[in-house]
């Protein structure tokens, strides 16, 4: 027969806390991005980024052109904004 009592294990939940850092409390939102390590992948990524940029610029110019044809010159000034606000208050619009 063994002599002495068994050593009791400490409660494992007491050790789980550990250090709570600022980053672990509030992680950043959004997708994570890992840069490619191969030269071909880097080249493809830059080409895709340039294509996306040119398409966005082209679409914005197209939409601005269509809007200016329908409405006229697109300008926002303080005087026009105040005049529009007066018309809305008076109900002329």
Curated annotation (Swiss-Prot):
Residues 1-32 are annotated as: Disordered. GO terms for cellular component: nucleolus; nucleus. Pfam families: DUF2462. InterPro entries: UPF0390. It comes from the Eukaryota. Residues 19-31 have a biased composition (Basic residues). Belongs to the UPF0390 family. This is UPF0390 protein C24B10.18. It comes from Schizosaccharomyces pombe (strain 972 / ATCC 24843) (Fission yeast).
């Amino acid at each position: 027969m063994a002599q002495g009592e068994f050593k009791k294990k400490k409660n494992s939940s007491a050790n789980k806390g550990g250090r709570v850092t600022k980053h672990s409390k509030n992680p950043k939102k959004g997708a994570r991005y890992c840069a490619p390590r191969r030269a071909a992948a880097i080249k493809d990524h830059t080409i895709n980024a340039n294509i996306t940029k040119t398409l966005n610029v082209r679409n914005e110019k197209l939409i601005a052109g269509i809007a200016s044809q329908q409405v006229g010159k697109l300008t926002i000034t303080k005087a026009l904004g105040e005049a529009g606000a007066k018309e809305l208050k008076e109900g002329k619009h």
